[in-house]
């Protein structure tokens, strides 16, 4: 079953940082396995990401194998300590109906 993933990143994680992470992963050309759609934006001074995934397992695999390592790499390249970036607030919702 498809899931909607909503990430609200800690203050200090800018939209430009998420752009750099997205660019480094190259997901504009092709989404990772299980990914259906991704958007990120800024609201109320915080970066947000919203994704649609085939499953929670596909999302979790992507986070561990790709997203976290790339976020660390981008943080270091920007002179930041990856351990101090913090974790996003994550909400996972099962999708009742998906129209493509």
What are the functions of these language-model segments?
Residues 1-69, 76-100:
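Short S/T/G/P-rich N-terminal loop/turn motif that feeds into the first structured element of a domain
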